[in-house]
Design a protein with these regions (language model features):
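Non-catalytic accessory regions flanking glycosidase/transglycosidase catalytic cores in CAZymes
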Residues: 1-210
Length: 210
């Protein structure tokens, strides 16, 4: 129960209704928390891999700002920037990529993170609304920052060495370590793009691989 006395305005940014007992080592899960009941249900399925965060939510709709951006999902909860996502509701990032990698490790699942390839949802934007396939063009600074560096930084976060002489690798590896996991995660696969097709996708994908 929350009781407020006096006059004024109160802004509530984040509310969690998780049970008092949560999944996992509290030192490992210092920020985002997982419900033991949901984790048990997942464990009982004996999954061999886990694709996250899903599909169309990665791509964004209308504007690139509502693409799922993994960098906003790590670090302390209070610093995780929420967005209005593709599905039309606020994405809290209460569970982000760090918690995802930890859960895969706990349940012996191979992680399969999905990152955007610089294309807005082709079904919604291109087919349903007839606005064409809107994308970030390869060869631009925006493409490097939003697509290429986005993939590289995730690899640094998951597998990077905290003592690396490469500044970006060391930075993201230390973000991981400060969250409770100094050792690298086991990551072998990355999905770039979701249910995309056509020249626009193949050009963006190829540019990301160069």
């Amino acid at each position: 129960v929350m009781v407020f006395k006096g006059n004024g305005h109160i802004g509530i940014d984040y509310v969690s209704l998780l049970p008092s007992t949560v999944w996992g080592d509290p030192d490992k899960y210092r920020n985002g928390k997982l419900s033991p009941r949901i984790v048990k249900a997942l464990k009982d399925c004996h999954p061999s891999f886990f694709r996250f965060p899903g599909g169309c939510v990665v791509e964004g709709d209308e504007v690139f700002d509502n693409q799922y951006k993994w960098r906003n999902t790590v670090g302390p909860l209070e610093t995780r920037k929420q967005i209005a996502n593709t599905w039309g509701y606020m994405q809290s990032y209460g569970v982000g990529f760090y918690e995802y990698f930890c859960l895969c490790e706990d349940l012996n699942m191979a992680p399969l993170p999905v990152l955007h390839v610089g294309l807005l949802c082709q079904i919604r934007v291109g087919e349903q609304r007839g606005e064409g396939y809107r994308r970030i063009m390869p060869g631009t600074r925006e493409f490097k920052a939003e697509v290429i560096d986005n993939v590289a930084d995730l690899l640094f976060f998951a597998k990077g060495d905290v003592n690396s002489p490469h500044a970006e690798e060391a930075y993201w590896a230390n973000v991981r370590a400060e969250m409770g996991h100094p050792a690298p995660f086991a990551l072998e696969y990355v999905g770039i793009g979701n249910e995309n097709w056509g020249t626009e996708y193949f050009e963006n994908f190829s540019a990301c691989m160069m």
